């Protein structure tokens, strides 16, 4: 299979390129500055030149708080940009796997299934949902939406590394971590084979997140336990950490599609990540 990865230099994209190569697939990557997904003509030309069998669309505006102030710009990238990739994929006759987020849900009534009602509570979620809908509108016969959550991996800034950095600071005896948000920590390493599997499934919406769920505080405690970090984790509230963008309380993604890939328990994936980083 020849794959095109748009956004291949990011945390997920780097792992996906490695995974595709390891599985014997031909993989081509495009990212800024060589592609601007908001430029439709350029996207169509670049995808056509790559002549892929499948397009993995990972490029996105991912600054959740920044999107509150710059929703128009975020919408241009996450909405129109995704539409452009869908149009280009359609014209190239390639399957499209577009990565989306748990933030398309309001976070008040999870866990959420693939067909649960969407109702994002922040600009970032609204722009990602717009991208989902525009891709399905332009290319219903070829678009697969893969929603994921709470990503961490070797090739980018992430919660696990940040917290271990804080926890190993000799001047600290504790860290305060939010305990009233619940989600599914997802390893980029585990997500990659799931995305490849989704490319072979019928068009539609798929949930691809770590098995089980926890709070940010629970996630941090397990990371500290595995990494043998001697630092107390104290529960705190979302309210105590005021941020521009509201966060969902419960954004647990449930897999109900029979043929959909199921990721292993988040604790097992985290154990591997901690082992590899030490």
Which residues does each PLM region occupy?
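NAD(P)H-binding glycine-rich loop region in Rossmannoid oxidoreductase-like domains
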Residues: 40-77, 88-90
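Adenosine-cofactor binding site in Rossmann-like domains, unifying the SAM/SAH pocket
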Residues: 21-45
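Mid/C-terminal beta-alpha module of Rossmann-like enzyme folds, strongest
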Residues: 192-195, 200-244, 274-277
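Catalytic helix-loop patch of NAD(P)-dependent Rossmann-fold dehydrogenases
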Residues: 76-84, 104-146, 150-151
